[in-house]
């Protein structure tokens, strides 16, 4: 196995050890973390609802969202290995205004997203526990965030890196099994079922929300760059290994989005039941309909899939937003390096703020989550352009990647303008 020295120094001035080229299990980390974070919000809720409401029709939008966002997520990995810095540091170099925009969005998203996924995880855990336990969703949410907090504060990145790989293996295995079982015994369509069409302006908000977090909000690329930086310092991975990790994580996330769409199609599409749109009510309905279709024995299987989705997303959101906000704070204060106390503070902020949202604003959580998804899509062209321009300034992109990136910006920008025009009443 050959070795080489890292060309770019660490952003914090650390001296990195000798790199080892080649394939091993240890190279996987940031890509798997991103996939774990993505699956909870966009996949379990939005993808499954898309299948339940419109069958296979919106599969093309899921594919297009993944295809056209790919280069801008990939640039996070490229930028870290090219410069030794996070994307957030790159935003700060371009303009403090970009840093402030990202910081404000991240502060809001941290508590809304963490609160939403924690509440869903708590509700699903309640489905799995015997009725005799008698714990409320709030109590279960406190238990979940306490586990996440101690896990992240005590173990930091290394422990998170190791555990999420096993979470992803369990999640993928259980999801594939659940979909295969549902495909073998799909819901029988009612005789008078009339398929609804999503291709109208009235459905545009749903499609934008679906694509906003598909596979994740584009500002999550900056969080991925924080994980990539931590992985690079911990294991001194090469650029090629980092890209392999990213590509595997992104591909797994994209494929699972279609599997969750299939779950909605096989279990709910054409059943004649009105599909719930609120996240908590929808998960309850999905589990009950899956059980009614497949059999009572399958309740724990689909509940386990749902819980692993949300628990994995909860812990990765808390860590990711904690790291991103700590990096923003470091750059705003002009400090040389990020420290564990700052990460611990902002991780606690995400978890504690999310818990406060659950406690006092649980009734508005669905609206907040939809707002977060839509705002993520509207801001996607901005962060896409930033990521593209940062990487382009450091290395010459191939003609194919350059054209691909421009096509992605046109797609994201065009859809955003269409949605804003519809919202303003200019069209429709």
Locate each region found by the language model.
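Membrane-interface "cap" regions at the ends of multi-pass membrane proteins
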Residues: 1-43, 206-208, 233-237, 241-248
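Juxtamembrane transmembrane-helix boundary signature
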Residues: 34, 61-92, 101-113
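Extracellular/periplasmic helix-exit of transmembrane alpha-helices
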Residues: 70-80, 228-229, 252-284
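Hydrophobic transmembrane alpha-helices that form the core helical bundles
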Residues: 99-131, 141, 310-328, 364-367
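Membrane-water interface regions at transmembrane-helix termini and the short interhelical loops
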Residues: 123-130, 145-167, 178-182, 356-365, ...
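Transmembrane alpha-helical segments of multi-pass small-molecule transport proteins
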Residues: 128-153, 169-180, 337-356, 378-387
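Membrane-interface loop-to-helix entry segments
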Residues: 151-184, 198, 373-380, 400-412
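Hydrophobic alpha-helical segments and their helix-loop junctions in multi-pass secondary transporters
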Residues: 169-197, 207-225, 383-395, 416-427
């Amino acid at each position: 196995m050959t070795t080489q020295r890292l060309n770019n120094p660490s952003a914090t001035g650390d001296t990195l050890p000798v790199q080892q080229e080649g394939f091993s299990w240890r190279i996987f980390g940031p890509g798997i973390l991103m996939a774990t974070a993505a699956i909870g919000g966009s996949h379990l809720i939005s993808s499954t609802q898309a299948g339940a409401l419109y069958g296979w029709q919106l599969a093309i939008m899921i594919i297009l969202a993944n295809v056209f966002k790919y280069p801008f997520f990939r640039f996070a990995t490229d930028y870290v290995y090219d410069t030794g810095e996070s994307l957030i540091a790159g935003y700060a170099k371009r303009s403090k205004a970009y840093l402030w925009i990202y910081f404000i969005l991240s502060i809001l998203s941290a508590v809304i997203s963490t609160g939403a996924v924690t509440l869903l995880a708590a509700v699903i855990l309640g489905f799995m526990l015997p009725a005799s336990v008698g714990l409320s969703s709030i109590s279960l949410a406190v238990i979940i965030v306490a586990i996440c907090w101690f896990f992240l504060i005590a173990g930091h990145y290394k422990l998170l890196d190791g555990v999420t790989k096993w979470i992803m293996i369990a999640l993928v295995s259980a999801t594939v099994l659940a979909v295969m079982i549902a495909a073998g015994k799909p819901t029988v369509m009612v005789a008078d079922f009339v398929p609804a069409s999503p291709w109208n302006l009235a459905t545009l908000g749903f499609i934008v929300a679906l694509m906003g977090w598909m596979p994740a909000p584009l500002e999550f690329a900056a969080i991925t760059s924080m994980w990539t930086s931590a992985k690079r310092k911990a294991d001194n991975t090469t650029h090629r290994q980092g890209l392999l990790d990213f590509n595997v994580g992104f591909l797994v996330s994209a494929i699972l989005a279609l599997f969750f769409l299939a779950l909605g199609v096989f279990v709910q599409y054409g059943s004649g039941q009105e599909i719930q749109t609120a996240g908590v009510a929808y998960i309850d309905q999905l589990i009950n309909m899956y059980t009614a279709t497949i059999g009572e024995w399958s309740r724990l299987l689909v509940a386990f899939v749902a819980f692993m989705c949300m628990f994995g997303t909860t812990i990765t959101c808390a860590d990711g937003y904690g790291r991103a906000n700590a990096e923003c704070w470091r750059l705003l204060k002009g400090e040389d390096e990020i420290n564990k106390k700052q990460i611990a503070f902002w991780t606690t902020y995400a978890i504690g703020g999310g818990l406060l949202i659950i406690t006092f604003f649980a009734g508005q959580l669905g609206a907040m989550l939809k707002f977060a998804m839509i705002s993520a899509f509207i801001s996607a062209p901005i962060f896409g352009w930033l990521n593209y321009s940062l990487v382009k300034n450091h290395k010459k992109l191939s003609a194919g990647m350059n054209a691909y990136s421009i096509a992605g910006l046109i797609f994201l920008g065009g859809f955003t303008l269409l949605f804003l025009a519809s919202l303003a009443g200019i069209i429709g």
